[in-house]
């Protein structure tokens, strides 16, 4: 009598290959819906220094306040949204100090707050998608705060009432490049699981790193001038149902690159006093010196010749700050309007870490449709999304934009 492997057709190589092919989608992963959400408390940037120094009991630091105010006014941010106001912060003097132990209180705020904000964005994306929750097969949740077990993906699935057999993935503590990371994950999941529909959610709360000003640590002051709270969600899937699902962008290729010898350019450390932020003045130059290589690499990896003029693409770079955008724009010889969507989101919301590039996707598709352009990508077919963050890590996503329907 032969072995099971010899006699069973289920164990044949041909059968395994057939199963593999049957599990794969036919087409490319597409973004089918986008939703965004932010907390209710609005803080105009031109008066943020007054609020910040008052809320942190630091008004006696007159010269430091003047310096911080100048920093705020150079950011090209108009306003930001937070899940706290001054009255709320008065309950937590350990958070508004510079380095008092405060992680427990920060965690108590972030652990429930992050999935709750993510739920708001997810519901908007699901409503636009128009399909029942039961069609969601995978969940990718991303945040840089509220580390806990069960993790934020579990909590969000429970809040939404997703099926208990949804495949969940949690992306913790990746920082500002992670909006690109989740698109890379979603592409792989959608294309390797036929019929799958991936709910992608990024949610960020800045209270994990909020702290009072300190003359010897201006990096944190810069962080406090840039970051805002927000959440964004996508539905990603391949082979959209014609007439029912409405694809916006195709995720053609996704690649991650670590810039050599750049680990100290941007780094953050979670400590008893919360998330400590460190950023070198060299960060804009480090990114701009390496971004073109990432772009050339992704085009060549799919057998395409990189464009002779980068202005022929639509652009969704992460708005790490005004200086980073200015340097990248100059290095690639881009016209000022190419970063319109990114600069608009930076002005309206600040730097929302991983959620930012998803907000920019939403802004670009909405403006393109409102202007009657031929594609959601400002009338252009091809574009790139760029995530920059600690490491230094660059996520490069090649997108193909589709016409509005």
Swiss-Prot record:
Composition skew (Polar residues), residue ranges: 1-10
Gene name linked to the record: PKS5
Binding site for CoA: 283, 320-323
GO MF term set: acyltransferase activity, transferring groups other than amino-acyl groups
The entry's keywords: Acyltransferase, Flavonoid biosynthesis, Transferase
Organism: Aloe arborescens (Kidachi aloe)
Protein name: Octaketide synthase 3
Domain of life of the source: Eukaryota
A Pfam family hit: Chal_sti_synt_C
GO annotation, biological process: flavonoid biosynthetic process; polyketide biosynthetic process
Region feature (Disordered): 1-22
Record site feature (Determines the polyketide chain length and product specificity), residues: 209
Active-site residues from the entry: 176
